A protein has these predicted regions:
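N-terminal small-domain helix-loop-helix segment of the aminotransferase-like
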Residues: 3-107, 301-304, 405
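Helix C-cap/helix->beta junction micro-motif
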Residues: 31, 208-209, 331, 365
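Conserved PLP-binding catalytic core of the aspartate aminotransferase-like
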Residues: 47, 317-318, 331-364
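Conserved core of the PLP fold type I
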Residues: 67-206, 220-235, 243
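PLP-dependent enzyme catalytic core of the Aspartate aminotransferase-like
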Residues: 89, 97, 351, 360-369, ...
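Conserved core segment of the aminotransferase class I/II
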Residues: 150-153, 234-315, 322, 326, ...
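Conserved glycine-rich beta-strand-loop-beta hairpin in the small C-terminal domain of fold type I
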Residues: 295, 299, 314-325, 335-347, ...
């Protein structure tokens, strides 16, 4: 008889977003005429930049000609040189020297954040910020690192509370020393962005204890304030303790196109093994690379035209964030984030439980948000609102929300 991975049976009933989808479908089935505005799941609404589309069209035509057809990508790290070089140069513009063979192109930061555990022992102690992007937790639970779920927390995880009192940035753990430390900045879901000094504290800690920081930088394109690092490798010492994940999804609208990249410096060594080499071995075995057409589209993001066009889309979402922040604040709600991130972390009124406030906004305002409790215990009493909607819909959502408070 085939035996299953028992860790899957420990997972709670449903991943956060499918549960939201279930409630939304149930409401829509009972109220078919009601037009919903979705400010929950962080999917973009603006189309791909013209420069990206043109590059993909050109690449598609190349695939239809024998002389320019591309099959499996046999170049380094399952990625074409043209894209890795463009990514490398973008780092160098910020004073970060990354070698092209330290860049691994993939089909999404979610995939890489979820799969990076393949190169680490199941015995590693994992630390996650609380609230936290659920993928970090669930993938480690699947791998057997999380222990058992007690209805609120996993018994083997180290939770790092991120609250209004500490500026939504975690303090160093006082008890167990984690081996793997997940940090997301700008943060999903709170919208907070870490300073160099804050990250340096964690870099020094990781280097002192031999830990590895798994740094999710998927939203760095939304940083608007000076002094906020776009990469953890802007922090001295990070190359010996950190892996960075980035994505084209929110910076260039690739949620339906799928392209991202992970940076693993060759200086990052644990137990005598290069993590760069281990990940290369893992990817070579389990991943055949992102399609040539998509990689050409991603390359175009770094062209002068592509940069200007994708920046315009980012600014569009930033303006949505401003509208949400100003509108909900004027209505008396406490709102965090939205300045360096496309997410706003909104305190529920009168200590209303997150799911109750989610249901109220769904049923009375026909607006879909994300309950903070779905991101962990410290998320209770908040909802996450995304700035990825259409501008007109965002204005209308704010009007609807304020009308039911």
């Amino acid at each position: 008889m085939a035996h299953i991975n028992q860790n899957f049976l420990k997972l709670p009933g449903g991943y956060l977003f499918p549960e939201i989808g279930r409630r939304v479908r149930a409401f829509s089935a009972q109220n078919p005429p009601m037009p919903l505005i979705r400010l929950g799941i962080g999917d973009v609404t603006q189309p791909l930049a013209p420069a990206v589309v043109d590059a993909m069209v050109k690449a598609s035509r190349e695939m239809g000609v024998k002389e320019t057809f591309r099959g499996y990508c046999e170049e380094t790290c399952c990625a074409y040189d043209f894209l890795r070089f463009a990514i490398r140069d973008s780092y160098r513009e910020r004073g970060v020297d990354i070698a092209d063979d330290e860049i691994f192109v993939s089909d999404g930061a979610k995939s890489d954040c979820g799969s990076i555990g393949d190169i680490f022992s199941a015995d590693n102690v994992v630390a996650v910020c609380d609230p936290v992007y659920p993928v970090y937790v669930d993938t480690n639970a699947m791998a057997g690192r999380a222990g058992d779920y007690d209805g609120e927390k996993w018994t083997n995880l180290v939770y790092l509370p991120c609250t209004a009192e500490n500026g939504f940035f975690p303090e160093l753990p006082r008890e167990r020393v984690p081996d793997l430390i997940y940090i997301c900045s700008p943060n999903n879901p709170t919208g907070a962005a870490a300073t160099c000094d804050q990250l340096k504290t964690w870099v020094d800690y990781a280097n002192a204890h031999g830990s590895v920081i798994l740094f999710d930088s998927a939203y760095e394109a939304y940083i608007s304030e000076e002094g906020i690092p776009h990469s953890i490798f802007e922090v001295e010492g990070a190359k010996t303790c950190a892996i960075e994940f980035r994505s084209f999804s929110k910076s260039a609208g690739f949620t339906g196109t799928r392209c991202a990249y992970t940076v693993i410096p060759k200086e990052l060594v644990r137990e005598g093994a290069s993590l760069n080499a281990l990940w290369s071995r893992r990817q070579g075995t389990k991943f055949n690379g992102v399609p040539y057409v998509v990689q050409r589209g991603a390359e175009a993001v770094f062209s002068p035209e592509g940069r200007a066009q994708t920046r315009a889309a980012v600014d569009y979402y930033r303006n949505n964030a401003r509208v949400i922040q100003e509108g909900l604040t004027a209505a008396g709600l406490t709102v965090y984030g939205g300045v360096n991130a496309p997410y706003l972390w909104v305190r529920t009124p009168n200590n209303t439980p997150s799911w109750d406030f989610f249901d109220l906004l769904l049923k009375q305002a026909c607006v879909v948000t994300t309950p903070g409790a779905g991101f962990g215990p410290s998320g209770e009493g908040y909802i996450r609102v995304t700035a990825f909607g259409d501008a007109e819909a965002t204005w209308e959502a704010v009007r609807r929300i304020t009308s039911v408070l």
